[in-house]
Amino acid sequence: MFPVAPKPQDSSQPSDRLMTEKQQEEAEWESINVLLMMHGLKPLSLVKRTDLKDLIIFDKQSSQRMRQNLKLLVEETSCQQNMIQELIETNQQLRNELQLEQSRAANQEQRANDLEQIMESVKSKIGELEDESLSRACHQQNKIKDLQKEQKTLQVKCQHYKKKRTEQEETIASLQMEVCRLKKEEEDRIVTQNRVFAYLCKRVPHTVLDRQLLCLIDYYESKIRKIHTQRQYKEDESQSEEENDYRNLDASPTYKGLLMSLQNQLKESKSKIDALSSEKLNLQKDLETRPTQHELRLYKQQVKKLEKALKKNVKLQELINHKKAEDTEKKDEPSKYNQQQALIDQRYFQVLCSINSIIHNPRAPVIIYKQTKGGVQNFNKDLVQDCGFEHLVPVIEMWADQLTSLKDLYKSLKTLSAELVPWLNLKKQDENEGIKVEDLLFIVDTMLEEVENKEKDSNMPHFQTLQAIVSHFQKLFDVPSLNGVYPRMNEVYTRLGEMNNAVRNLQELLELDSSSSLCVLVSTVGKLCRLINEDVNEQVMQVLGPEDLQSIIYKLEEHEEFFPAFQAFTNDLLEILEIDDLDAIVPAVKKLKVLSY
């Protein structure tokens, strides 16, 4: 569309006016071309032709309207370009803000994850510390129990050893007294031997025969002492029986009782007189069997002859031949055999004397001592005929029976201790080892201590109440058998310890008093959770703000309405400019603008 120039007229004034209008119109068209070129459009050209076939002619009003329309279009395109630029800038800002929010959200999420990991690690450490503390507490309690048991056992052992020490001290004192007594007896015996020997032989003993004679003297002196002791014992018994008889006489209320008691006393006195007469006869026989002075002189002469013969034999040993030596040996064999037999008899006699002294010791048991008395009375008649040691056999047999019965006593005490003290671990007695009285005393002492403790602890509940408590525990904690009671008690104890530790830690964290109840703890934890939730909401509101939230909602709604048109417009621009990226739109438009200039 090109406007046609008007035809020239004849008058000059109208021509001038037309020229000015033409120039003005051309200037307006030039300004419009400039605008079109600025916006990348092709300019319009004014032509001066007479041929009007290919031309469309507008009048002044239509050309003016055309110019106005073009101006409006150009202005609208510029406004749209500005609007697009603003939209691009706002889009970039929104992207930047979105990236910032995403980075903030990622940082917050990372921080929350880190805090969760830290909290989990702290929880695990707290659990480990609680387990360690529980295990240490259990270990310490077990140690304390073991130490208490050891202390009790040591106290028992200490008491036992104290008793043993006192017994040993008593035995040592008695042994010392016995040693002193034996020393004194030995000294007295040696003195009497030497005195009798000096009285008989008028010299000091220095040969083997003298020693044998001393042994013989000792033997007879011991028999004499024994007879004296028996006689004194019988006299004491007779005195005690007479006293008892007098007491019985005093106690008899009637005359018949007095007569009966007198008859009994007469019978007993007759029997005692007979016994004393028999003892007197025995003593007389014993005195008759003793050697006389004449026999002692003969013994001395024989000893002197034997000494001389021995001296001669020693001097003539090298000179006499083998046959004479054999003859002398044959002659000396009976005397040597007699000497050896005498020594053996002497040793046997000493052993029997020591056994007899042990049996007659006052420290011997009472029953055994009484039985030895009876044995002495029974063997009274044969004491002189034999050596007087026949009563030792039944006593030793009875002692052997008592020692064998110790095993039965040990078994019965063991069963009794299993009933009274089942936790006492008794050592298994070896069959080869003998049973000691100390072991039996230890068992009896432990049972007595247990009985005393039971008497002291009289407030202990009955067995039925304890059984009811155990059954109630089984019902409460679902324990089918008694074997599962201790594991379930340990489990309950550990759970209770964990709960107490957790409550204590919460009280320390919340700065509560240790005497505060669980209701107070639960209420404070609930308040803390509510405060934390309110703080989180306030922090979210502080970050985003209530007005920003509403504006973001409005912006999102506007963007939902605006983005489809903007997307279509940008796609058209990308196709026209032949580019693929939104960031390349602005540089391409700038290039076109430069090219248009």
Curated annotation (Swiss-Prot):
Principal localisation: cytoplasm
- Sequence ranges of the TPR repeats: 483-516
Q: Where is this region: Disordered?
A: 1-23
Q: One GO term of the cellular component aspect?
A: cytosol
Where is the protein situated, by its record's location annotation? Answer: Cytoplasm, Cytoskeleton, Microtubule organizing center, Centrosome
Name any one GO molecular function: identical protein binding
**Keyword line:** Coiled coil, Cytoplasm, Cytoskeleton, TPR repeat
Q: Which residues form a coiled coil?
A: 75-179, 254-326
GO terms classed as biological process: cilium assembly; regulation of microtubule cytoskeleton organization
The record describes the protein's role as:
Plays a role in the organization of both preexisting and nascent microtubules in interphase cells. During mitosis, required for the organization and orientation of the mitotic spindle.
> What quaternary structure, including any partners, is listed in this protein's UniProt entry?
Directly interacts with tubulin-gamma; this interaction determines centrosomal localization.
Q: What is known of its domains?
A: The coiled-coil domains may be important for tubulin-gamma-binding and hence for centrosomal localization.
Question: What's the protein called, per UniProt?
Answer: Centrosomal protein of 70 kDa
Q: Which organism is it from?
A: Homo sapiens
